[in-house]
Swiss-Prot record:
Keyword Secreted: no
GO molecular function: methenyltetrahydrofolate cyclohydrolase activity; methylenetetrahydrofolate dehydrogenase (NADP+) activity
Transmembrane segments: none
Protein name as catalogued: Bifunctional protein FolD
């Protein structure tokens, strides 16, 4: 039987570092980090993620501002909120919950986030830095994937890695981060032929497609590492893309949902807000 990769345990050390940083600043009467999180509409995964952000931020003494907009807002409505946050010196990080409702122009809206406050690497400039290897904020979910794999103390170099999903939020950036670790990376998507065959050759399988319990044991190589990035509402519960019960006996390591990638992602987001505050003061 495979082992569970506990995102909460991996996050603990980082949380302690954040807590110490915030406490020192409070003690010296210095500004503490503040994150503003924008949610448009009522996407289940986004609501869950925002709630997690708020809970962790509060536990670490980081200020958290929730901005919830109706689903029928316009591009300009969202952009106006972003501009206010760009101009607010007390806000170090802006988090826009994706996906946005389909009638909104996601690229146009994202472009308006200040790169100095883009703590989840959403803007073109931030992503350009990522792909060119320049210093900048790493996208939190992809960084969480890499951090969890590294927590297993395995050498990623030369490993066959399949990333299932090609979104700009997870699939593409996580593939780039894995390439930076010298993995051999294959990206699969809805048009990939013989998907089971491709996935079943992976030493490491990263799944980010938003289809609850889509991946079962037939997609898994014996003793593979399986990282489930999915968070969907399914039968009243938050569920991943991997059918955990069917995969755990075949894989060597699997991340649960909840308690896996998402548990660490939120912590890395807050860590980025601390880094943004340091950059602002420098």
């Amino acid at each position: 039987m495979g082992q569970i990769i506990n995102g909460k345990e991996v996050a603990l050390k980082i949380k302690e570092e954040i807590k110490t940083f915030v406490e020192e600043r409070k003690k010296n009467k210095l500004r503490i980090p503040k994150i503003a999180s924008i949610l448009v509409g009522n996407d289940g995964g986004s609501i869950y993620y925002m709630s997690s952000q708020e809970k962790v931020a509060n536990s670490l003494g980081v200020d958290f501002l929730k901005i919830i907009l109706e689903e029928n807002v316009t591009d300009d409505d969202v952009i106006n909120e972003i501009h206010k946050l760009n101009d607010d010196v007390n806000v170090q990080g802006i988090m826009l919950q994706l996906p946005l409702p389909k009638h909104l122009n996601e690229k146009k809206i994202i472009k308006e986030i200040s790169v100095k406050k883009d703590i989840d690497c959403l803007t073109f400039e931030s992503q350009g830095k990522l792909y060119m290897g320049e210093k900048g904020f790493l996208p939190c979910t992809p960084n969480s994937v890499i951090t969890l794999i590294k927590s297993l103390k395995i050498d990623i170099t030369g490993k066959e890695v399949v990333v299932l999903g090609r979104s700009n939020i997870v699939g593409k950036p996580v593939a780039q981060l894995l390439l930076n670790e010298n993995a051999t990376v294959t990206i699969c998507h809805s048009k990939t032929k013989d998907l089971k065959e491709v996935c079943s050759k992976a030493d490491i399988l990263v799944v980010a497609i938003g289809k609850p319990k889509f991946i079962d044991e037939e997609y898994i190589k014996e003793n593979a590492i399986v990282i489930d990035v999915g968070t969907s509402s399914f039968e009243g519960k938050i569920t991943g893309d991997v059918n955990f019960d069917k995969v755990i006996d075949k894989a060597s390591f699997v991340t649960p949902v909840p308690g896996g990638v998402g548990a660490l992602t939120t912590t890395l987001l807050i860590k980025n807000s601390c880094e943004a505050l340091k950059e602002y003061e420098d």
